[in-house]
Structures are given as C-alpha cells and as structure tokens.
A protein has these predicted regions:
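Flexible, compositionally biased loop and terminal segments
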Residues: 1-295
Length: 295
C-alpha cells in the first residue's frame, strides 16, 4: 500500500512482556486525517492482497490464519468484509465462533477451532476464536462449569495453563506452515456507546443489537484486564498481535489490510516453476489446439 509501507508495524506486539493497553490509543490514525485518502488506498491494498493470495494458492505450501478478537461493535465483521472483498473465495474461508454447542462443550477447548484451521494455500479467518476461553470465560467464570472439565483440574492456575496451551498450539501450527496474525480491534468505551445507539436508531441495524451487549458493557474494565493479559501472555514473533485502533473504521481496515499484506510479502511467494518436461507437454498441447480442424 504505497502511502503506508508496513504502516501497521507500530501496532504490532510480538513480545508481550511490557505491553500495556493504555499505551495504545483507540482514536489513533497516525497522522492520516482523511477518510478520503484511506478510501483511495484500501482498493490498492486489496488489489495487492489479491495478487499475493493467488500466489499463495498456486504455491500450496503456506497457510495464513487471521484471528479477530474485540468487544462488540468494534467492527470485526466490517473489517473482514471490506479487506477480503477482492480475494478469490476459493482460497479463503471465514469461520464465526458463536457460543459453543453442547457437542463442542464436551470436547477440549481447542477442538472446535482445530477443525477449521486452513489447509496449505488458503487464508482462514476466525471471527472470535479459542481466545474466548481466556476472555469471556474468564470474565464469566460460571461458564467453566459448562465445559465439563473435571473440577480437580480447575485450579487458580487454569488461565496460566490455557495461555501455555495456546502458545504451544500456535507454535505447532507455525511449524506446520500456518502463519498466524492476530488482531485486537481496540475500541474506546465512548465509541462503543455511539455505535450501540446507532444500532438502536437505524432499523437496518436493529438486528445487530442484543440486550446482553449492554450487560457486557458494564464489565468493560474486567474485559480490558483480560485482553491486556491475553496479549501480554500470547504475543510471540511467530504469532504476533496487532492492537489496531478501532474508533475510525476506515483506518482500522487500512491497517488490517497492511498487516496481512506484510505477512504475505514476508513469505516470498511465487508461482510454481515449470519443469522442462512440463514445458514440452504445454508446447505439444498448444500445437494440438492450433491444428484442431486443420485435417
């Protein structure tokens, strides 16, 4: 993206030890004042993303897993929709993880997402993910009971254990050719209120609103503490977090696109080389096609 080469780097966290959420401003747009500028840049970014995805698919070696986590109304759906709009649907899969089903609750906490990890050559997108297990389940500890974990295993160390499990799992995926990029869309409490009110005022947005949204808002501080520790404990060089400002949707989308492009460019993707035997075969096929009907 010409005006923003690796612009998203300032929001990248690949070592969480010193991470503090208060150091990241949800309103930031790093000097980009105009939505117009972003609207010109985003299509260029999407075009570049589409070229890279085509090579990823053809090369069939790496997979990309993009994970989106955020508070309600932060713009996860919109970011996914706008940024991935130019990507070939054959090479991209989106999974939204809602409340777990009884079947999912009867399995280990990574089971439902493991089935959806993208195969080589594909981009997989998780709209929410296994990170819910250290977010909503941590804020609402009664949810642990529904997970049917033996009580003797639910100790005060459970969150540390889950962070360790997630880190080991992401390391395992990386060693198997899955490149992970994780996005926390960092929305301010004031902006969430505005977006909730607009959902209530606009009939076309009413369906997005749920009474539980307001109840969850009352636990905002608890969620911020959970998000901060999640990033501190699971940001690694092979699976970094991007703490993307989310108060300006146009800026969020630009930064998400930039981070995905930079992850793909790091892979030095190219179309598979054609062997001499294959070239010979192609030449013969061309000759046959050109001589069709000349008998």
């Amino acid at each position: 993206m010409s005006a923003a080469p690796d612009f998203s780097k300032r929001y990248r966290v690949d070592n969480g030890r010193k991470f503090r959420l208060k150091d990241f401003d949800p309103r930031d747009s790093s000097g980009l004042k105009s939505k117009k500028h972003a609207e010109k840049e985003l299509p260029r970014g999407i075009e570049r993303l589409s070229e890279l995805q085509d090579k990823l698919y053809a090369q069939d070696r790496w997979a990309i897993l993009l994970i989106f986590q955020a508070m309600d109304a932060a713009g996860k759906d919109g970011a996914i929709k706008h940024v991935m709009s130019g990507v070939n649907p054959q090479g991209c899969q989106v999974y939204s993880f809602k409340q777990p089903s009884p079947e999912e609750l009867n399995h280990d906490f990574l089971w439902r997402t493991s089935k959806c990890v993208p195969e080589h050559g594909r981009i997989g997108i998780f709209n929410r993910s296994y990170y819910e297990e250290v977010l909503v389940v941590r804020v609402h500890k009664e949810l642990l009971e529904r997970e049917r974990t033996p009580p003797s295993l639910v100790t005060k160390n459970i969150w540390n254990e889950r962070f360790a499990d997630i880190n080991a799992y992401e390391h395992y995926l990386f060693r198997n050719g899955v490149v992970i990029r994780k996005f926390f869309l960092n929305l301010s409490k004031e902006e969430q209120k505005k977006r909730f009110l607009s959902r209530l005022e606009e009939p076309a947005k009413n369906w997005k609103f749920s009474a539980s949204d307001v109840a969850e808002r009352e636990r905002w501080h608890e969620y911020m503490v959970a998000y901060e520790e999640m990033i501190q404990r699971t940001a690694t060089p092979h699976a970094p977090w991007y703490v993307v400002p989310a108060d300006k949707k146009w800026y969020t989308r630009l930064m998400v696109a930039d981070a995905i492009i930079s992850a793909l460019e790091d892979l030095n993707l190219h179309y598979p080389a054609v062997s001499a035997a294959k070239r010979k075969e192609l030449k013969a096929a061309r000759v046959a096609l050109e001589h069709e009907g000349h008998h």
